[in-house]
Design a protein with these regions (language model features):
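Substrate-binding pocket helix/loop in short-chain dehydrogenase/reductase
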Residues: 99-100, 104-109
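Conserved glycine-rich Rossmann-like NAD(P)H-binding loop of the short-chain dehydrogenase/reductase
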Residues: 30-47
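The beta1-alpha1 cofactor-binding region of Rossmann-like NAD(H)/NADP(H)-dependent oxidoreductases
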Residues: 41-42, 63-73, 105
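Conserved glycine-rich cofactor-binding loop
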Residues: 9, 16-17
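Residue(s) in the substrate-gating loop at a strand-loop-helix junction
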Residues: 143
Length: 250
């Protein structure tokens, strides 16, 4: 039986774990050739080998999304190694929470560079390729934090609100070229993201939120939403998907 994405090429950033890894598995399982980008090359290589041994096509590319040159090379590698680029999933991200007052400025810089500039750089490299092909799909991973701001997450909110704004403006620019744009906004997902935080109040708040939700989302839940969006007919442009675990209030 033919896969829904047979003949398609997808590039996924932040592919070494969490939502990125789950998305690689979901898209490859539907028949797509996948380019895996992240800094942890050992994990990428192992995952790409697993996909290839299962009969799929995959290439692992060391990627630092904060470098425009690295982002451009990643997109070029997808083209040269796999034969094109149909889908880009901008998943790489970090979440470093805490109050504005006294915040380590390097953490703010990291979030802006990874969550915003990284997404911009990869998109900038991908759009001309997709425009030339007459079609494409860009999926940007935002968050519920891109819809509602809360104390203790000001700069993370800023980055994710920015993802939403950029995605809508991009949609207006490129939809006439056959390029679709989707923003995915997950709630609490069981990934490494929460473990980036060290501020005691933040760590406690995350743990309390986890306890307040009967069952948090899994990375595969988000990957399923991405697969849904990218397998719709070309006439269907799924622009926004908000996903919370049942019981999450905010």
């Amino acid at each position: 039986m033919a896969g829904l994405l047979d003949g398609k090429v997808a590039a996924i950033t932040g592919a070494s774990s969490g939502i990125g890894e789950a998305t690689v598995r979901a898209l490859a399982g539907a028949g797509a050739a996948v380019a895996l980008g992240a800094r942890r090359v050992d994990r990428l290589t192992a995952l790409a080998s697993e996909i290839s041994e299962g009969g799929g096509r995959a290439t692992a590319v060391e990627l630092d999304v904060t470098s425009s040159d690295s982002a451009s090379s990643f997109i070029s590698s997808a083209q040269s190694e796999l034969g094109g680029l149909d889908i880009l999933v901008n998943n790489a991200g970090v979440m470093l929470l805490g109050p504005v007052e006294g915040a380590p400025l390097d953490q703010w810089r990291t979030m802006v560079e990874v969550n915003v500039l990284g997404l911009l750089y990869c998109t900038h490299a991908a759009v001309p390729v997709m425009r030339s092909a007459g079609a494409g799909h860009i999926v940007n991973i935002s968050s519920v934090a891109g819809r509602s701001a809360n104390a203790g997450s000001a700069v993370y909110n800023l980055t994710k609100f920015g993802v939403g704004a950029f995605s809508e403006a991009l949609r207006q620019e490129v939809s006439s070229a056959g390029i679709r744009t989707t923003v995915i906004e997950p709630g609490f997902v069981d990934t490494e993201l929460q473990g980036h935080n060290e501020h005691p109040a933040v760590v406690e708040g995350i743990e309390q939120m986890r306890k307040s939700v009967p069952e948090v989302l899994q990375a595969s839940d988000i990957a399923s939403a991405i697969l849904y969006a990218v397998t719709q007919p070309q006439r269907v442009d799924v622009n926004e998907v908000l996903i919370r675990p049942t019981g999450q209030r905010r």
